[in-house]
């Protein structure tokens, strides 16, 4: 989701940009319509443009969520051609049984949806999430506005890779923060040519 759903608090610093009440089950079909993925990307680009108008000189893209290492691993598999085993980590500390299930779900999602690794929008709409779409848009928007943007974490680096596949020149504005403990991080960072500054053992 791109908003805090049913929050009892009014907080002007939080920008709610809902694309719907969650994505669909990627193990059964596409996560969202292609036009919804495009809308998410454009929303992120708009946020970056607004930041520039507000006088912001550097952006940072991170995330807070549960379950989004699953979609990020699926997206990275599609973009990189790497096997599920190579890019999938335990996320929030899964048990062995849950970790096995996670990998099976990703395998099934890729088999059912057959995302085109040469088309990042196809990948995002089939096996991505609203968060990844918006984050990719922020990366693209930052580059368009010539703003440096910090890439923070696994989900962020996968979104950055989507952005760079849409516009190769965008990667010149990306700054790596820390090396995520998630298995696929180094693969995505290598594909981006990103060199993170810190090793903190964080996911």
Task: Enumerate the predicted regions with their spans.
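Short, small-residue-biased leader/transition segments that mark boundaries at the very start
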Residues: 2-4
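Small/polar-residue-rich loop-to-helix segments that shape phosphate-bearing ligand pockets
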Residues: 7-49, 106-121, 125-126
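Glycine-rich, mobile lid/loop segments that gate access to catalytic sites or pores
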Residues: 19-68, 74-83, 91-95
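Generic secondary-structure signature for well-ordered alpha-helical cores
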Residues: 42, 46-53, 78-85, 104-115, ...
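Phosphate/pyrophosphate-binding betaalpha-module
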Residues: 59, 70-134
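Glycine-rich phosphate-binding loop
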Residues: 61-64, 68, 130-165
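Short beta-alpha connecting loops at secondary-structure transitions
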Residues: 87-92, 171-176, 196-203
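Internal helix-turn-beta structural module
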Residues: 182-203
């Amino acid at each position: 989701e791109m908003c805090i759903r049913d929050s009892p608090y009014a907080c002007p610093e939080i920008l709610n940009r809902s694309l719907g009440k969650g994505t669909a089950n990627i193990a059964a079909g596409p996560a969202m319509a292609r036009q919804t993925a495009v809308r998410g990307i454009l929303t992120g680009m708009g946020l970056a443009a607004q930041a520039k108008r507000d006088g912001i000189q550097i952006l940072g893209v991170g995330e807070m969520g549960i379950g989004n290492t699953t979609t990020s691993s699926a997206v990275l598999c599609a973009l990189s051609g790497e096997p599920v085993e190579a890019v999938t980590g335990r996320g929030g500390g899964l048990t062995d049984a849950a970790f096995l299930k996670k990998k099976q779900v990703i395998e099934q999602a890729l088999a059912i949806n057959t995302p085109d690794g040469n088309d990042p929008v196809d990948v995002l709409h089939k096996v991505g999430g609203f968060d990844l779409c918006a984050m990719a848009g922020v990366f693209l928007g930052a580059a368009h506005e010539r703003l440096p943007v910090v890439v923070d974490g696994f989900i962020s680096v996968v979104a950055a890779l989507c952005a760079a596949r849409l516009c190769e020149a965008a990667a010149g504005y990306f700054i790596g923060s820390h090396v995520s403990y998630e298995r696929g991080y180094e693969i995505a960072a290598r594909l981006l040519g990103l060199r993170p500054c810190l090793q903190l053992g964080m996911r």
